[in-house]
Curated annotation (Swiss-Prot):
Keyword Lipoprotein attributed: yes
Organism: Homo sapiens
InterPro entries linked to this entry: P-loop_NTPase, Small_GTP-bd, Small_GTPase, Small_GTPase_RasD
Record protein name field: GTP-binding protein Rhes
The keyword Disulfide bond belongs to this UniProt entry's keyword annotation: no
Mod. after translation: Farnesylated. Farnesylation is required for membrane targeting.
Motif (Effector region): 48-56
Protein purpose: GTPase signaling protein that binds to and hydrolyzes GTP. Regulates signaling pathways involving G-proteins-coupled receptor and heterotrimeric proteins such as GNB1, GNB2 and GNB3. May be involved in selected striatal competencies, mainly locomotor activity and motor coordination.
Cysteine methyl ester PTM sites in chain numbering: 263
GO molecular function annotation: G-protein beta-subunit binding; GTP binding; GTPase activity
Keywords: Cell membrane, GTP-binding, Lipoprotein, Membrane, Methylation, Nucleotide-binding, Prenylation
UniProt xrefs under SMART domains: RAB, RAN, RAS, RHO
Localization: Cell membrane
Length: 266
């Protein structure tokens, strides 16, 4: 199955198995959108704008193979619990963000981590077993200093203790401290190409009307070890119906993969 993205004179076909969604969750004013902005364009915005829900898409050409990463930057207020549950169900990798100078935001991350594990476990019919999920818990604003800290490092690290699919980082989106390292570890845990990390691919800047022109991206000759990444200016949040179909297809693929593994072992 291929996902086809079309614009202008160019068509990009991304295999379904190479399409992923990253979901960013946390309380309001903890810096979720700032971390996403660092990932997409390396910039930091000082002005705070409340997020209802932002959707972004980044397309990669890594050694000739196409990959797609959708990024869902969620609201910290979560006025619609059903939509947040749907966002969790569609997620492949997760970033849970709290502010090191805000104890309540850390408590929210603990609740979110529990909810994600419960929702994903139910999806896999493993209600008594934690789902294996690539997840980073991110303590943001470490540039504020120790006097402002309300969450000890040792306490935050307990949330990831004993889980090889979960890691903890203290970062500063403002100073761009540990942000690249955090994404590198997250993608490594998810078994995604390392080149999807912000620092490990060439960024292609494109004009809105020329985003998928053959020469800048999809028909460009790439060297064997080259990796390119491009933020799509046309990304739209999929409909609820599309998300439900996405979940169904993902569960089906995972089931088929487990059956293949059983046959191989036998």
């Amino acid at each position: 199955m291929m996902k086809t993205l079309s614009s202008g004179n160019c068509t990009l076909s991304v295999p379904a198995k190479n399409s992923y969604r990253m979901v960013v969750l946390g309380a309001s004013r903890v810096g979720k959108s700032s971390i996403v902005s660092r990932f997409l364009n390396g910039r930091f915005e000082d002005q705070y704008t409340p997020t209802i829900e932002d959707f972004h898409r980044k397309v990669y050409n890594i050694r000739g193979d196409m990959y797609q990463l959708d990024i869902l930057d969620t609201s910290g207020n979560h006025p619609f619990p059903a939509m947040r549950r749907l966002s969790i169900l569609t997620g492949d990798v997760f970033i849970l963000v709290f502010s090191l100078d805000n104890r309540e935001s850390f408590d929210e991350v603990k609740r979110l981590q529990k909810q994600i594990l419960e929702v994903k476990s139910c999806l896999k019919n493993k209600t008594k077993e934690a789902a294996e999920l690539p997840m980073v818990i991110c303590g943001n604003k470490n540039d504020h200093g120790e006097l402002c800290r309300q969450v000890p490092t040792t306490e935050a690290e307990l949330l990831v203790s004993g889980d090889e699919n979960c890691a903890y980082f203290e970062v500063s989106a403002k100073k761009n401290t540990n942000v690249d390292e955090m994404f590198y570890v997250l993608f490594s845990m998810a078994k995604l190409p390392h080149e999807m990390s912000p620092a490990l691919h060439r960024k292609i800047s494109v004009q809105y009307g020329d985003a998928f022109h053959p020469r800048p991206f999809c028909m460009r000759r790439v060297k064997e070890m080259d990796a390119y990444g491009m933020v799509s200016p046309f990304a739209r949040r999929p409909s609820v119906n599309s998300d439900l179909k996405y979940i169904k297809a993902k569960v089906l693929r995972e089931g088929q993969a487990r059956e293949r593994d059983k046959c191989t072992i036998q």
